[in-house]
């Protein structure tokens, strides 16, 4: 039986919010908040994959297992691919990528993503989404939108508003079409993870800065379904960080 592992990619030099992995949230760095949240799950192991000796030292100080990776990876998935190779995970094992900037991610959603990959044998990756109810979120590029087919396989991910109902204003869109926000959690089998790092990086991946588009561009399937529980958006900006801090201080 395949083991299931959680790997948290943690890059120090974030472009939108520098050093956010170490940002203080109610007395603890964000990476520790994420780690402590995912330890509530019952998976076989939890690893932090980072390019930073500073993050490694801090993470090990609170008991995390850490793999130090190169600092030139194009995405968190590339970083995880290096980490699982170093760790020697079996090809049939499943790895769940939990973003290092989502300290409030529900454990139920992590388990759901892993089970979805097990259930959808044609998919090489699984992920989650939730319905957008606020029109402003449709046009926020930090909220990645997704459209999917009738069999719950992703068609496209974008920072733009997709779909778009022609003939209606931007404010009217929310009442016409269904919009779904992608939740940045992925499950993959180790065999595909190792292959992912060798795949062609497409122009659309570079334009959108979305690593999952590499999977679609190269002809593979991503299974997707609505999350069991609502997931607060990740921390991309200082405003996001302040919102999360308030939630922890309640």
Curated annotation (Swiss-Prot):
It is an enzyme of class 2 (transferase). GO terms for molecular function: 3-deoxy-manno-octulosonate cytidylyltransferase activity. It catalyses: 3-deoxy-alpha-D-manno-oct-2-ulosonate + CTP = CMP-3-deoxy-beta-D-manno-octulosonate + diphosphate. Pathway: Nucleotide-sugar biosynthesis; CMP-3-deoxy-D-manno-octulosonate biosynthesis; CMP-3-deoxy-D-manno-octulosonate from 3-deoxy-D-manno-octulosonate and CTP: step 1/1; Bacterial outer membrane biogenesis; lipopolysaccharide biosynthesis. GO terms for biological process: CMP-keto-3-deoxy-D-manno-octulosonic acid biosynthetic process; lipopolysaccharide biosynthetic process. Its EC number is 2.7.7.38. It is found in: Cytoplasm. Activates KDO (a required 8-carbon sugar) for incorporation into bacterial lipopolysaccharide in Gram-negative bacteria. This is 3-deoxy-manno-octulosonate cytidylyltransferase. It comes from Francisella tularensis subsp. holarctica (strain LVS).
């Amino acid at each position: 039986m395949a083991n299931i592992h959680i790997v948290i990619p943690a890059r120090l030099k974030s472009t939108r919010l520098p050093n956010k992995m170490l940002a203080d949230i109610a007395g603890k760095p964000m990476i520790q908040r994420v780690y402590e949240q995912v330890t509530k799950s019952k998976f076989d192991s939890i690893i932090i994959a980072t390019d930073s000796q500073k993050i490694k030292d801090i993470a090990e100080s609170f008991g995390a297992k850490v793999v130090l990776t190169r600092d030139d990876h194009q995405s968190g998935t590339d970083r995880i691919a290096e980490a699982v190779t170093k760790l020697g995970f079996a090809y049939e094992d499943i790895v769940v990528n939990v973003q290092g900037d989502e300290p409030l991610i529900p454990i139920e959603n992590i388990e759901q993503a892993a089970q979805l990959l097990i259930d959808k044998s044609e998919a090489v990756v699984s992920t989650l989404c939730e319905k957008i109810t606020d029109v402003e979120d449709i046009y926020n590029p930090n909220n990645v939108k997704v459209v999917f087919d009738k069999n719950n396989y992703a068609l496209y991910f974008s920072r733009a508003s997709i779909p778009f109902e022609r003939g209606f204003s931007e404010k009217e869109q929310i009442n016409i079409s269904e919009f779904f926000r992608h939740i940045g959690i992925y499950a993959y089998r180790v065999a595909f993870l190792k292959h992912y790092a060798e795949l062609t990086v497409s122009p659309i991946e570079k334009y959108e800065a979305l690593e999952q588009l590499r999977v679609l561009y190269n002809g593979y399937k991503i299974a997707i379904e609505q999350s069991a529980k609502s997931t607060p958006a990740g921390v991309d900006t200082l405003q996001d960080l302040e919102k999360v801090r308030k939630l922890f201080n309640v």
